[in-house]
Regions:
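Multi-pass alpha-helical transmembrane bundles in non-GPCR membrane proteins
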Residues: 1-220
Length: 220
């Protein structure tokens, strides 16, 4: 029996993203292990692991077309991992860049929000896309609570990449919410959802650059 991808465009884009994240994991962890403390390798390990989990879950969901029950569970996992990756992206910023009471409180807040998001998706994975986008974008911008400390702690270039990633993620979330039906009608395997995937990949790339080039080198 020939295997056929359920959503080829979505499966391929995030399959590529998973491979890129896996390739980037080793150099990131090697660089973070140069410090004598364990905070660098733990925080950056959480960052890259949660990124890989998101892309693995997304690739699996968009690749496999099984029973309605299995598909629903895979969809829940896919959506839940978005909250997990957002929290994972915050972790190095909170524990390394800030490394103070503000950072610890923000880290606890984003992970608590991630848990609430996971519970929400467990019970209402079919909620309107705009609700999902509001939740993801809102969680992503919790950093405004510590905006000035982050600006002062990161080099200008590092903050620029961090901000660029946040903006790109936000644009992707808006595209996800709008769905762009006219575009979808013209491109069967590469519609608004796949464009959303590309924006998520670009946002991840920006944040990987921040972590590898700036955060991994920061003393605490």
């Amino acid at each position: 029996m020939k295997f056929k991808l359920k959503d080829p465009g979505s499966a391929i884009t995030h399959g590529i993203a998973f491979l890129l994240a896996a390739v980037g994991a080793a150099p990131l962890l090697i660089r973070s292990s140069e410090w004598s403390d364990h905070i660098h390798i733990v925080a950056l390990g959480v960052f890259i692991l949660t990124m890989m989990l998101l892309y693995a879950a997304s690739t699996l969901y968009h690749s496999v077309d099984s029973t309605a029950k299995v598909n629903r569970r895979l969809k829940k996992l896919d959506h839940m991992m978005i909250f997990v990756m957002i929290a994972g992206s915050y972790t190095p910023v909170c524990l390394i860049v800030l490394h103070n009471k503000i950072g610890y409180v923000l880290c606890a807040l984003v992970w608590a929000t991630a848990i609430l998001g996971i519970v929400f998706k467990a019970f209402w994975v079919t909620c309107p896309k705009w609700i999902s986008s509001v939740l993801y974008i809102g969680m992503g911008w919790l950093c405004v609570l510590a905006f000035m400390p982050i600006i002062h702690a990161l080099p200008k270039a590092g903050f620029g990449w961090l901000l660029a990633g946040g903006i790109i993620y936000t644009i992707g979330g808006v595209i996800y919410a709008l769905k762009l039906p006219i575009f979808n009608a013209k491109h069967k395997n590469f519609g608004s959802h796949e464009i959303f995937h590309v924006f998520i990949m670009l946002g991840s790339a920006c944040h990987f650059i921040v972590m590898y080039c700036f955060v991994a080198n920061m003393p605490i």
